[in-house]
Amino acid sequence: MTTPRKFDEYRWNVLVDGVPLNVESRYPISDPSTGRYLTQVPDCAEADVDRAVQASRQAQAEWGALPPRARAAKLRELITLLREHREEFAMLDAIDGGFPISMMRNDVDAALELMDIFADMALDLGGKTIPVSTNLHFTTHEPFGVVARIGAFNHPFFFAASKVAAPLMAGNSVILKAPDQTPLSSLRLAEVAAEVLPQNLLITISGRGRVAGRAIVRHPQIKRIGFIGSTDTGRSIQRDAAEVAVKHISLELGGKNAQIVFADADLEQAALGAVNGMNFTWTAGQSCGSTSRLLVHESVADQVIARVVELVSAIAVGPPLDENAQMGPLVSQAQYDKSVHAIGEGIREGAKVVAGGGRPEGVGEGGWYLAPTVLADVRPGSFIEQNEIFGPVLSVIIFATDDEAVAIANGVEYGLTASVWTSDITRAHLIARRVEAGYVLVNGGSRHYWGLPFGGVKSSGVGSEESMEELISYTETKTTTVVLG
């Protein structure tokens, strides 16, 4: 499976015990660049999920008994093998998700780097002694057993590969739920991983979320779940899981992230940061971390908006396998319709389209293409200012005072990221302290730094990832006391 023309003939499978699982039904996957049929994948049922979990339990027992450095060595073997398949995984995500292949190569590289960082943390899995008495008291970190990772469609390979690293390093086996819309790289990951990892240690399940995903969440032998996706689905997972067992659940959910540009900021860098932070050229704005609200001080608003419009209008939209394309289509008809509806609501409430707003030129009639869009004169509290669009739509809001900027930034249910642009170091610290976000950048867009905890507050999630916090979260702490006399 190395070229686009093989999609029709390649049979995608869920592997259990080293062979394809006999899944009764399949469902179609569409090509976002044309809107037409691409391929079909297994649509796993509850019984299929249970079969995978039972196989995974057997694999975990031996894996969890290995010393952490031995697990790290195996993880690095996997990293080396995945690197050999870099172009294949980038192509899969480009075709399956509509994302520019150049950016998907970056996604593969980022995933492998983060996996390597988790391998580096092997010896940090030790516990500690606590001198609370003359006896010996110590803690150890022990794996949960079988854990589940449920990925999102917008960074398919990155969320598959990098998000299984911490659970595996911690000694767990992993059931990986492939995204409904973009399952191909997750399925291929399991095929490649089977060449170096113990059998059934990593099993990818494909299928509709309402059946396969729900079966994973409700399975009584999966006690740890990590989910990336929408806030509504995150709440559903919490409800479903609570009905069957007490489970440890981490959630990286939606965002309506603000970039706050003060009058004393480097306005050129702020404009660049606003456009880059929107992830137009990575995922067509389909990112929980997209900085979709640009808050600009009234004294510099015209200047900043003009530069943002210039930058956005220069983005080349085209087919994902075109090396010159900087932005591809949206992943599905549903995502396209959601963005178009949001733009319409914004206009209805008084916003003005200053860039994009419709279908870009030169992409033909097929596919779910939408030009990168900027809306000015967006009112705080309006539909488009409050709701996560998950598309290429940037809203510009004007503020007059620091207090007003903070109030607008905090006036949504989300709290994932925020950016503060200012040359005043005191203001930078004060605003960063006041904004309600789990990840704050000063004079920066939306870059992740691997090793730093990343996670949201409010309705943006529970828990932190990409860091030691993520690794430890896939263990349970055991305290032991040895009475010495």
UniProtKB/Swiss-Prot annotation:
GO terms for biological process: phenanthrene catabolic process. The keyword Oxidoreductase applies. It is an enzyme of class 1 (oxidoreductase). Optimum pH is 9.0. It catalyses: 2-formylbenzoate + NAD(+) + H2O = phthalate + NADH + 2 H(+). One of its GO terms (molecular function) is 2-formylbenzoate dehydrogenase (NAD+) activity. Its EC number is 1.2.1.78. Optimum temperature is 40 degrees Celsius. NAD(+) binds at G229, S230, T231, D232, T233, G234. Pfam families: Aldedh. Induction: By phenanthrene. Keywords: Aromatic hydrocarbons catabolism, NAD, Oxidoreductase. The active site is at E252 (proton acceptor), C288 (nucleophile). Inhibited weakly by Mn(2+), Mg(2+) and Ca(2+), but not affected by Zn(2+), Co(2+), Cu(2+), EDTA or EGTA. Plays a role in phenanthrene catabolism by catalyzing the oxidation of 2-carboxybenzaldehyde to phthalic acid. Not active with 3-carboxybenzaldehyde, 4-carboxybenzaldehyde, benzaldehyde, salicylaldehyde, 2-methylbenzaldehyde, 2-chlorobenzaldehyde, 2-fluorobenzaldehyde, 2-benzaldehydesulfonate, 2-methoxybenzaldehyde, 1-hydroxy-2-naphthoaldehyde or n-hexylaldehyde. Belongs to the aldehyde dehydrogenase family. Homotetramer. This is 2-formylbenzoate dehydrogenase. It comes from Nocardioides sp. (strain KP7).
